[in-house]
Amino acid sequence: LVSVRHLPIYFDDKGAKEAGLLNPASTVKVLEEKGDYVEVEIDGWRKAKGFGRVIQEDFGKNIAVASLLKEASTDANVVTAGEKKVDELTGLPWEKVAAKVWIKKESMLNDINPVWEKSKEAYKTNCSVCHTQPAEAHFDANTWPGMFDGMLAFVNLDTDSEALILKYLQKHSSDYAEGHH
């Protein structure tokens, strides 16, 4: 399943206690369904410093999948850590993680393509007002957030739209595109 907006994630199938937020355009694996809630696994990497609250999509790439509350990020029943390695570029230690949490069955799609199509259209529409927008693969995944933030003051986007467009740009950056840079 793929999220289409920021969604609260919970410790249990009652939604009584929030564990954090799932970011837009994030893929999760369904483990179990119970009433209005679905238990999902969020796979990714986190920096192995501090509380490791932000789960990133790939090793060394700042493409946020979810942000956990401190209590959830340090709970062994929620987060399982695996392989550890150091990012040669930054010297920061990272670890592979899987977080098991619950979400409400809403704002989720079975396919990422409609999300990318809407994000691409929003990028083309909003980011060509002042200038010709750079090709998605012109920057790498970690450069796009800074470039994108610099342009946000000139457009009127809500938080979910901003996050969707940024993730679209990162997932179509030079790190993921064929034949660029």
Name the predicted role of every residue range:
Residues 13, 41-115:
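Boundary regions of SH3-family modules and the immediately adjacent low-complexity/disordered segments
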Residues 132-155:
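Gly/Gly-Pro-rich "capping" loops immediately C-terminal to redox-active cysteine motifs
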Residues 1-36:
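Beta-loop motif signature
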Residues 123, 145-149, 160-165:
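N-terminal intrinsically disordered, low-complexity, charge/repeat-rich segments that act as generic
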Residues 155-181:
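C-terminal capping alpha-helices of c-type cytochrome domains
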Residues 117-121:
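Short, flexible, mixed-charge glycine/proline-rich loop motifs
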Residues 123-134, 165, 169:
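The canonical Cys-X-X-Cys-His
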